[in-house]
Amino acid sequence: MMGGEAMTQKNVDVLGLVTARFERSVAVPEAFFAEQAGRIAEACWAMARRFHQGGRLLAFGNGAWATDAQHVSVEFVHPVIVGKRALPALALTNDSAILSGLRVGSAGGVPFAHQLAVLARPQDIAMGLSPDGCCTNVVEALAEAQRLGLLTVGLAGGDGGPMARAGLDFCFVVETDDPLVIQETHETLYHVLWELVHVFFEHERLLR
């Protein structure tokens, strides 16, 4: 009986942790999207116009955010919703030979800026993803994208760091220090960006 009571107490504690985590995972994105809805709509329109002009999405980030760059790219190239058009997108984090080659002699991580200088066209979209906006190579790549005339979109967390002060066309900062909630919110955000870009494509007169 004593063991059963102890297990029950442990279960209650675990349930409390689960509930707290869920509440945080709901409250932060709810506040973020309530505040940023207008800017998100503007970003979607700007992205849709670039795609309409023949542009591509070029996404990049480090670590777990490197896989987010791949995730958002595949969403555009291979839409999960039947009937939505495929749009050109590329994650700069995909090619291991290029990444390892560029990393040699680089003290600041993978120089995404070099890839943009070689691959990007002025009508393209650069999307940089970072947990705190402080990833030097991501911020430098966005600066290179600005120099080249790309539409620049940054996704960050915390206070946004240097990314938030870089004068990007759009910078969306999830104001929490919890990296899990930041990533969850970023994922929802780029799903929304994908969906609304297609809404604008369904009303192409708005893109002229």
Regions found by a protein language model. Give the residues of each.
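Short, glycine/polar-rich helix-capping loops at beta-to-alpha or helix-loop-helix junctions
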Residues: L155-F170
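Surface-exposed amphipathic alpha-helices with a cationic face
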Residues: L142-Q146
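Generic N-terminal amphipathic, Lys/Arg-enriched alpha-helix
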Residues: M1-A34
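Short beta->alpha connector loops at strand-helix junctions that form conserved
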Residues: T93, S130, A156, F172-L180
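A charged, well-structured terminal subsegment
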Residues: V118, L180-R208
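Short glycine/serine/threonine-rich phosphate/pyrophosphate-binding segments
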Residues: W65-Q70, C134-A141
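Glycine-rich, small/polar surface segments that engage phosphate groups of diverse ligands
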Residues: W45-A120
